[in-house]
Amino acid sequence: MVSKKVYFLTSNPHKAKEVSDVLSQFSIEVVPLKGEKLEIQADSVEEVARFAAEEAKKRFKERPLLLEDSGLFVDALKGFPGPYSNYVYRTLGLEGLLKLMEGVEDRRARFVCAAALVKEDDKIVIEVGEVEGEIAYEPRGDKGFGFDPIFVPLGYEKTFAELGEEVKKRISHRARAFMKIAKHLSGE
Amino acid sequence: MVSKKVYFLTSNPHKAKEVSDVLSQFSIEVVPLKGEKLEIQADSVEEVARFAAEEAKKRFKERPLLLEDSGLFVDALKGFPGPYSNYVYRTLGLEGLLKLMEGVEDRRARFVCAAALVKEDDKIVIEVGEVEGEIAYEPRGDKGFGFDPIFVPLGYEKTFAELGEEVKKRISHRARAFMKIAKHLSGE
């Protein structure tokens, strides 16, 4: 099978690794493109990813160009921290989120990833992947990054940070979004 | 004294009223310009206001054009909620912020406002106003908006929501930023 090359705009090496793990299963080679994407304030990761893709396509000439935005949406907190998950992780941390969930019985949450593809013809495709789960009562595990140590995906008893890449590359929000993107790339 | 007219881009009627209260003291008339400003994700309100002003000056022809971005920065929470104060107010609310501060002795916080002025010659001026204070232990008062009911400015025992506009128009972050802006407008 001929391998295809795509560029992935990110400043997060964890994300580059995860996207590469997913796309390599489709014989797609991921070339990290170091740089900042422009992120707007919006209530959905789709909106953030779409705006970032529109802006990045003017600034970068590499094609196909990928980027993504993702977040943890906690039902009992009206979706918080949502698209601001990175900022909230850096300020409140896992402890802050767990404090907000103290005494809260409804632990349901979902990770959502919006992946954006800027195609050779400059058209933009957005695909969204989600994984449902629950917020744990304490951090567990040391794999992954961000809120992984307190997220238990539906059907599992371990957190993403305990399960690690073998499971994440099959069921994570990012895996699900980029598997859909892989179909667009193979079809090009 | 000749009154001068300025346009203020906002979707928040409370902010329009507060800015008008401040600038009317300088014989400056504020005309609200209804519309959304484009807000980026950034760790400071200055960055958010500057980007919004650069974008707004392309989209609106009215001059002088004002806009602002503001936020509540809590020391013990590494500045959270900062530039995302509106989102955090809509999701976690006052209760969520108070829950994060449970058992926290260091209550210090500051409201920061970055006011942007797009002048007749399209040059942009940014002025920042701050007010120091503390996070209260429970909400008090029904004036103002946002986090006003849990913010006690330094030198006072009441919250902004108890003190109301007579005090806010003299000492608030927004008042302080727009008093500096008034000097630019009078000097034009």
From Swiss-Prot, chains A, B:
Swiss-Prot/TrEMBL keywords: Hydrolase, Magnesium, Metal-binding, Nucleotide metabolism, Nucleotide-binding
Active site: 69 (proton acceptor)
Positions annotated to bind substrate: 10-15, 70, 145-148, 168, 173-174
GO terms, molecular function: dITP diphosphatase activity; ITP diphosphatase activity; metal ion binding; nucleotide binding; ribonucleoside triphosphate phosphatase activity; XTP diphosphatase activity
Cofactor note: Binds 1 Mg(2+) ion per subunit.
Catalytic activity: XTP + H2O = XMP + diphosphate + H(+); dITP + H2O = dIMP + diphosphate + H(+); ITP + H2O = IMP + diphosphate + H(+)
Pfam families (alphabetical): Ham1p_like (PF01725)
Enzyme class: hydrolase
Ligand binding (Mg(2+)): 39, 69
CC cofactor: Mg(2+)
EC number: 3.6.1.66
Stored InterPro entries: dITP/XTP_pyrophosphatase (IPR020922), ITPase-like_fam (IPR029001), RdgB/HAM1 (IPR002637)
GO cellular component, one term: cytoplasm
GO biological process: nucleotide metabolic process; purine nucleoside triphosphate catabolic process
Record function comment: Pyrophosphatase that catalyzes the hydrolysis of nucleoside triphosphates to their monophosphate derivatives, with a high preference for the non-canonical purine nucleotides XTP (xanthosine triphosphate), dITP (deoxyinosine triphosphate) and ITP. Seems to function as a house-cleaning enzyme that removes non-canonical purine nucleotides from the nucleotide pool, thus preventing their incorporation into DNA/RNA and avoiding chromosomal lesions.
Entries under PANTHER family matching the protein: INOSINE TRIPHOSPHATE PYROPHOSPHATASE, INOSINE TRIPHOSPHATE PYROPHOSPHATASE/HAM1 PROTEIN
Subunit structure: Homodimer.
Family label: Belongs to the HAM1 NTPase family.
Protein name in UniProt: dITP/XTP pyrophosphatase
